[in-house]
């Protein structure tokens, strides 16, 4: 279960980083409702996408069981490397000064693609995938809400650091899968 919590924290770093950026664009009086709305979008998508990855992984598992640790390693490692590279970018490139439901939907999908890929690794963990997805959704909800709050206080300089830490965490998990399999 500790692996699921670590995975949830690592996956939530994308959403946390984007939430900081969203929070930095809003005035103090609008932070509370924005924080809840952002957290709902990001938490929901981060919870749904691993199920999609898990189901895909189960289909692959039947014909490639001996390769699944390597596939999970490769996916987590590549996601981690991507997150580290993304942490050096300038942040959210599109104009989010008008945060609409459409913008939040696009951002929620974009930040949860890695959760879908990571869902594949749930086939290797001795956990109920639905409980794992609920944990991932809950952790992402909390981090997204906190991200909006932090964004209003700390600005955007924390965005990249959160994504970097998430990337390192996924790489460490990938290495652990190879070592223990």
From Swiss-Prot:
State its location(s): Cell inner membrane
Q: Is Ion transport among this UniProt entry's keywords?
A: yes
Give the CC-aspect GO terms: plasma membrane
Instruction: Give the molecular function GO annotations.
Output: manganese ion transmembrane transporter activity
Q: Where are the transmembrane segments?
A: 4-24, 32-52, 68-88, 103-123, 130-150, 161-181
Q: Tell me the membrane topology, using the record's own terms.
A: Multi-pass membrane protein
Task: Tell me the domain of life.
Answer: Bacteria
Q: Which Pfam families match?
A: Mntp (PF02659)
Which keywords does the record carry? Answer: Cell inner membrane, Cell membrane, Ion transport, Manganese, Membrane, Transmembrane, Transmembrane helix, Transport
Described function: Probably functions as a manganese efflux pump.
Q: Which family does it belong to?
A: Belongs to the MntP (TC 9.B.29) family.
Protein name, as recorded: Putative manganese efflux pump MntP
Which gene does this sequence derive from?
Answer: mntP
């Amino acid at each position: 279960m500790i692996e699921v919590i670590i995975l949830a924290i690592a996956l939530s770093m994308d959403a946390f980083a984007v939430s900081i950026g969203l929070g930095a664009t809003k005035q103090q009086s609008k932070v509370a409702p924005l924080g809840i709305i952002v957290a709902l979008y990001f938490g929901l998508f981060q919870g749904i996408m691993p199920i999609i990855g898990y189901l895909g992984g189960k289909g692959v598992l039947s014909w490639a069981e001996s390769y699944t640790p390597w596939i999970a390693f490769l996916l987590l490692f590549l996601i981690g490397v991507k997150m580290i590279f993304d942490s050096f970018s300038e942040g959210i490139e599109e104009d989010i000064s008008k945060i609409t439901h459409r913008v939040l939907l696009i951002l929620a999908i974009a930040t949860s693609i890695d959760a879908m890929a990571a869902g594949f690794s749930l086939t290797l963990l001795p956990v109920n995938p639905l409980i794992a997805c609920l944990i991932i959704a809950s952790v992402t909800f909390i981090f997204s809400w906190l991200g909006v709050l932090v964004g209003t206080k700390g600005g955007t300089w924390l965005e990249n650091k959160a994504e970097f830490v998430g990337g390192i965490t996924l790489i460490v998990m990938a290495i652990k899968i190879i070592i223990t399999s």
